Amino acid sequence: MSCLEPLKKQKLLVIQSKIHSMKYSTTEFLKTATNTAEHFGFRKVEGFKNEPLCKNCSTTLSHTITPEDISQNTHNGLLSSYIATFCDNNLHALNAPVLLYSTEQIADTQDISIAFNIFNVQKSIAEAILIQMSRSLLQDLGHTDHTVRINSLGDNESATRYSRELANFLKKRLDSMSSNARESMKEHPLKALLELIKEDHDLSYRCPNPLEYLSDQSRKHFREIVEYLDMTETPYEIDPKMVNNFDCYSDALFSIEDKNFADNEASNLSIQGGRYDDFIFNKTKNRIPAVGTIITLKGINKPLTRIPRNKKSEPDVYVVQLGFGPKIRSLMIIDELRRAGIPVHHDLASDSLSAQIREAEARGVRYTIIVGQKEFIDQTVILRDMKERNQENIRPDQMLKKLKKQLALA
């Protein structure tokens, strides 16, 4: 992990999953994706419209996004669409984490796109949620053998410094570059790098490493994402050449690739994502933390006539955590509860134990699962019965059995 030594500031992730065969229908894909999203706490915009803070909001959040921006069949266009949805529906008034998902069919290609966005969460737990949810979705779709590739371009300060060094490096070697790469240099050095990577040019292996130019904040953020991967025993590799969609995203980038994928085969399923704090600032002139994942099912070639709706059951469990390690452990518990068919509430972005307990009480859940630093070290949880007002320290596997029995899910 020596390449982690020279890191530095913020969060840009890019997930790109290459899946070599589609073994499920469009309906199965959407049903699985929406079930997974809603378990992790994501809602459609309709689920926010009746929120009093949104309905009664008197302060609008203006933006410069046009219909032409949204119509672009690019990451730029898709992200613009999500920002417009956030602003136009007064979701900024919530002043709290907003986990939003949406489904659409791309007009030009008929591909099905489902997007997951997390607003108002600056911490790396937002990226961890998106990575974990994406991996869970892939596993549910039958793609269990995959690896995470990760990189970071850092925040604006980091990216500017890296772009300058990259430009200086390439300008000294223009004679050895192809005409396409030289032409791309006129627009942006990272665009030239993407062309060199596409050509598998020797320079693409010798270019400056973006991880060496990260600010302190970006280095810390990137390390936290890597810690999450280590703690969850997720196979991963650090790839400094992964600079996709640099014009949209900032900070940590990652991809998830099926190990069985052959380079000469077409991919049916694409998963791409990233943090776009700077992008949203350019559109709104407001500092709003934002991370998103776009999952696209390709090769549909027919209109989507029906988007399946899930039958929702009100969760009777709330997961409470305090601390970085407990957040990651809680994320894994939430995923285990998903596999067991137990719906759950959570606020993984919260750093207040009392606020989470109050929220659990307000929601009227029967059980809270509490993971603090002691429980994290001891590899236990506190299972609290909110009705009987008693609690016990218990191993996660025992907790799962008890919940299934008490909630009649065994």
List the predicted regions and their residue ranges:
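TRNA-recognition modules of translation machinery and tRNA-sensing kinases, especially anticodon-binding
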Residues: 2-410
